[in-house]
């Protein structure tokens, strides 16, 4: 499994309520992506940074979801290019289930 951390500056005069509304608007599309196991939206008002933490089945799935179209959309909406980092997640804890989930490769 792959953990992906995406961060971007929040410009364009957006307030917290604007950012949350934009996040909520994107939820249905993320729910449709069967390669996405988990997503947490991020917001840091002090540093004007937003983003997300994603858990994916594979690096290919992560890169596919956050290609040029996604990056251009972030630039247009939030006023900055996203920074994207990938991490292997060999063990994942799920406190809402009975077992830890281990990566298969």
Where are these regions (language model features)?
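Short S/T/G/P-rich N-terminal loop/turn motif that feeds into the first structured element of a domain
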Residues: 1-50, 59-68, 78-105
């Amino acid at each position: 499994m792959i953990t992906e951390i995406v961060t971007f500056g929040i410009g364009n005069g957006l307030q917290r309520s604007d950012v949350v509304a934009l996040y909520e608007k994107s939820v249905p599309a993320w729910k449709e992506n069967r390669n996405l196991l988990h997503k947490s939206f991020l917001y840091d008002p002090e540093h004007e940074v937003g983003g997300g933490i994603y858990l994916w089945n594979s690096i290919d799935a992560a890169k596919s979801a956050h290609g040029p179209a996604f990056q251009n959309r972030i630039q247009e909406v939030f006023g900055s290019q996203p920074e994207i980092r990938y991490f292997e997640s060999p063990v994942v804890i799920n406190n809402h289930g009975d077992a830890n989930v281990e990566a298969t490769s």
